[in-house]
Amino acid sequence: MEFDAVLLLSFGGPEGPEQVRPFLENVTRGRGVPPERLDAVAEHYMHFGGVSPINGINRALVTELRAEVGLPVYFGNRNWEPYVEDTVMAMRDNGVKRAAVFATSAWSGYSGCTQYVEDIARARRAAGPDAPELVKLRSYFDHPLFVEMFADAIAAAAATVPKGARLVFTAHSIPVAADRRCGPGLYSRQVAYAASLVAAAAGYDDYDLAWQSRSGPPQVPWLEPDVADHLEMLRAGGVKAVIVCPIGFVADHIEVVWDLDAELRAQAQDAGIALARAATPNADRRFARLARGLIEELRSGGEPARVGGPDSVSGCLAGVNGEPCRPPHCAARETAPQGA
């Protein structure tokens, strides 16, 4: 399978104070999120001048992708400019016939995979009958470069805190019911498996997995433990240093720079705990190499590059033109709002 372009497909984020509320309304449309909740989340963005880091990171990643794949690289978002519909129309007008779609999510499940599939289908409808063929690349939570980037980030973070720091992986929480529908437990098992691979690569036999950034009614159970509660448990157990690795995020979303770098760090300081946050891949050149590798798998028909290990978990394979991915285990809708 040959390609004449690449589409980097992401979540989107505001780039000025006046964009914050419209962006959040896009993210939460149809979910019945009360206005006061939007106001609270908007304040998180205002701490950064109303600018999410995600679009700048993705533009830098586009530059790295162009250098790696040697093809035109386009950039489109679900929830803010550049909208994926506009990007795909531009691809059509430029004569693109088939593009590989690299989504900024390593996971399966509705939020991690199916929403991006829906984005592709919606964008192709907007572009009409001459829309390019769009092939979404497979999930990559167990790709060797994914594991390597996070393992190296943990090593760098460990150098900034006392020896013996406790390693804690985090990922975005989702409702327990949603996690059960998609597998069952597909997303949480993928995260746990990826954490085990990264921990082993970083030289850790013992570590923790916690969840972050939950929302919704308190009576609805979400994946636990919450990272803030887990940090309190570590404090009570006498832990004095922690390395937090946000393995669920391939870039610095607002959940990383606010929920971890601001709120969790403040909690750690109050508790007398030294906290280091491991970097996300962002625009690391290896992330672009990872994407190139996924494209080469489709070109050559070769075996996928995966880090093997006990308790391995299946992921989504490539999907074409917004058709459901294979295996078909991402159809159930989750309700977890993600940030950017």
From Swiss-Prot:
One GO cellular component assignment for this chain's record is:
cytoplasm
Where Fe-coproporphyrin III is bound, by residue? S52, Y116
* Highest rank taxon of the organism: Bacteria
UniProt cross-references to Gene3D superfamilies, sorted A to Z: 3.40.50.1400
Q: GO molecular function, one example?
A: ferrochelatase activity
Keyword Thylakoid found: no
Report the pathway entry.
Porphyrin-containing compound metabolism; protoheme biosynthesis
As recorded in UniProt, its EC number(s) are: 4.99.1.9
An example Gene Ontology biological process = heme biosynthetic process
Location in the cell reads: Cytoplasm
Name the catalysed reactions.
Answer: Fe-coproporphyrin III + 2 H(+) = coproporphyrin III + Fe(2+)
Q: Where does Fe(2+) bind?
A: H172, E255
Keywords for this entry? Cytoplasm, Heme biosynthesis, Iron, Lyase, Metal-binding, Porphyrin biosynthesis
CDD domains assigned: Ferrochelatase_C (cd00419), Ferrochelatase_N (cd03411)
Belongs to which family? Belongs to the ferrochelatase family.
Described purpose of this protein according to its UniProt entry:
Involved in coproporphyrin-dependent heme b biosynthesis. Catalyzes the insertion of ferrous iron into coproporphyrin III to form Fe-coproporphyrin III.
Name of this protein: Coproporphyrin III ferrochelatase
Q: In which organism is this protein found?
A: Mycobacterium ulcerans (strain Agy99)
